[in-house]
Amino acid sequence: MIGVILVLASLLSVGGQLCQKQATRPLTAGGRRRHLMLWLGLALICMGAAMVLWLLVLQTLPVGIAYPMLSLNFVWVTLAAWKIWHEQVPPRHWLGVALIISGIIILGSAA
């Protein structure tokens, strides 16, 4: 169960970061303020919820195990940037993502 909460905390944190990115996207001048407030508001909600879930994780897992699991954020952000905004991800970056996933698996199996 704590693993599910950890993944959800990670996803919400990433959701908040992606909302911040979306808030910076160019728009016509007329809707800029509303666009900015919407995405920054969503970012705050996501990051606030992530923080609450993260506190639950820290009550259960040692911080030395839990914190490295947040490396999942790098994986989620890379995938989202690639899929949502069609950002180019070089092979070297994908190798880094694979190494992060490997590290998470190794650390997770030690928990």
Curated annotation (Swiss-Prot):
Coiled-coil spans in chain: none
Subcellular localization: Cell inner membrane
Family matches, as SUPFAM superfamilies: Multidrug resistance efflux transporter EmrE
Transmembrane segment boundaries: 38-58, 61-81, 91-111
Keywords, ordered alphabetically: Cell inner membrane, Cell membrane, Lipid A biosynthesis, Lipid biosynthesis, Lipid metabolism, Lipopolysaccharide biosynthesis, Membrane, Transmembrane, Transmembrane helix, Transport
GO BP, one annotated term: lipid A biosynthetic process
Any single Gene Ontology cellular-component annotation: plasma membrane
Listed PANTHER family: 4-AMINO-4-DEOXY-L-ARABINOSE-PHOSPHOUNDECAPRENOL FLIPPASE SUBUNIT ARNE-RELATED (PTHR30561:SF23), SMR FAMILY PROTON-DEPENDENT DRUG EFFLUX TRANSPORTER SUGE (PTHR30561)
Family from the record: Belongs to the ArnE family.
Main function: Translocates 4-amino-4-deoxy-L-arabinose-phosphoundecaprenol (alpha-L-Ara4N-phosphoundecaprenol) from the cytoplasmic to the periplasmic side of the inner membrane.
Name under which the protein is recorded: Probable 4-amino-4-deoxy-L-arabinose-phosphoundecaprenol flippase subunit ArnE
Organism name: Salmonella newport (strain SL254)
Lineage: Bacteria, Pseudomonadati, Pseudomonadota, Gammaproteobacteria, Enterobacterales
UniProt gene name: arnE
